[in-house]
Amino acid sequence: MGVTQENKVIARTVLGAFGGKPKVTKYWDDNKNSSIDILSVSDQPQEGITSYSTLGLSDHSINYEVNGTPLRIEIVAAMESASDIYANVLSTCAFNIINSNFTCAPGVIFKNVISMYDQETDMKHIMFVPPFLWEEDLELLEFSNKNVTWLMALPISEGELQVAEKHGSDYLQDLLESKQIDIFDIKRESVV
């Protein structure tokens, strides 16, 4: 199946937000049944950081509708370029939606998607948050058959997961912001 017009618009929108020179890599699930394209741009939004976005995830349902129109997502992230696992982490998040029908919204946590690739870091899970790094540029896209928005994949630790489970994801987001965590550092220490 070729690239749809909608996905071309999505790719242009993401590239407009990220800037720089894009690279697109196709990732396959373990059974080679499903694939997802991951766009990456090195040294964006700053030197030593790579920005990522899924392309085509919005072709799959997250089980949400707004006024009768399916709401779909693409996942964005930014991580130290030295980390070579983050595209894999994003593809695993995408396959959770594509193959396992996970739902996804702000505050939702996908467990153990980092620890699958790196057991040495405190960061184990992904919490989805609004894409605050690019909020000016990644606005809702309205198509005839779907609306597309973006969620940012934010690494969290086991302790931070427990805080979210006890007090809610908004509480955890406020805590992470108050501690001024380095969102680009997958090896950062847990705040709890």
From Swiss-Prot:
Coiled-coil residue spans: none
Purpose: Immunity component of one of 6 LXG toxin-immunity modules in this strain. They promote kin selection, mediate competition in biofilms, and drive spatial segregation of different strains, indicating that LXG toxins may help avoid warfare between strains in biofilms. Mediates intercellular competition during biofilm formation; disruption of the operon disadvantages the bacteria, but overexpression of the cognate immunity protein restores growth in competition with wild-type. In situ neutralizes the toxic effect of cognate toxin YqcG.
Main location: cytoplasm
Protein name, as recorded: Immunity protein YqcF
InterPro entries: SUFU-like_domain (IPR020941)
Keywords: Cytoplasm
Subunit record text: Probably interacts with cognate toxin YqcG but not with other non-cognate toxins. The interaction inhibits the toxic activity of YqcG.
Pfam families in the cross-refs: SUFU
GO cellular component, as recorded: cytoplasm
Location in the cell: Cytoplasm
Phenotype of gene-disrupted mutants: Deletion of the yqcF-yqcG operon has no visible growth phenotype, however it is out-competed by wild-type cells.
Regulation: induction: Expressed on rich and minimal solid media likely in early stationary phase; dependent on DegSU. Not expressed in liquid LB, but only under conditions that promote biofilm formation.
